[in-house]
Amino acid sequence: MEQMGVYSTIHHPSNDRLEVVRERIKDIELEEVQNLEDAWLALDSGDLDLVLAPANLVWNDRIKLASMQFDVVAALTRNHPHHVLVSEDGLEHFPAGGIVLCDEPLIHRQIRRRRNKIDIRKFDTMEIEPTTAEGLRTAQNLIQSGEINGFVTHRGAYDAAGLNGRRHALHNDPEARGLPRFVPTPFCDLIVIIARQGYPGHTLSDWTDEHAFNSWIVQRTVMHRTPAELHEFVGIHYRQQQIGSILTEAERVNDLFILDNLIDPEGDVDDQPRYEIIVELLSKDGLRTTSIERIGPISRLSVDIQFMMNDWNSILERFMTEADGFIQP
């Protein structure tokens, strides 16, 4: 029987996610691991055959994993690939100077873009540790006492900490046309499976998700092709849908970009499932944005993402070299 190490954080609760698919996992024994360094050593020695871990941490260890000849071979279904604002009111109803706690540089800029007069602070200014359930509950108590107006956390962390305050999704909402959007941080809500090179990832298909694995491939590619000093300021949205669902949504909100991409001049539409990718960078004050978007058949994803990144690099080169270029850390 194979052994799989499972590593969880409050933002990416891998154990909780596994409960949904546990009945479909065959011939694999699960073992909770306390830190990733030990997990990599166990995978290298053969004590483990697989490791399940948050994709953002796997990305951070990418150089080490490449040197150890490990590969990401599959991913779990994403539930809520976005952050939430825990607050009694949405951003549109915040008072001028309202206080929000947020440790994500990208979301800091996105909030500035939506409401420039909000006071955005880091959690440590209130001596709060946002990676623990206790810390998040303390932040919720500060809302109730009126010391702050809200705070930003992962949707998964909201559930894991047992929070019950009102929450507002910070995502790319098609219904909110005309309002600045929230493109997710890289690898948000993405949990992946790592194995030694050569492992047959297709044998895990009964309980893993191709959509999520494609999301890993796309986000990894975007990050590889984006200068490292900009990584914490880039937002990446990826989803795939059947053509009927995409058209229904686009027609409801009158999204001409999507409709023009999917319907040919004769009014015909093929029935291939489509991917949607949005990559975005914001200026420090959140007032200027550069982005690139693509929609296409999933069958062309591996080719299209490379052409898209060529265009993305051309955009970045222009804005990083101009005298008034605004894409700065």
PLM feature segments, named:
Residues 55-58, 103-108:
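Short, polar loop motifs at secondary-structure junctions
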Residues 5-11, 97-104:
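Short beta-strand->loop
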Residues 52, 101, 152-154:
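Structural motif
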Residues 70, 79-88, 181, 187-193:
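Small-molecule pocket liners
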Residues 67-73, 93-94, 114-124:
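A short alpha->loop->secondary-structure connector
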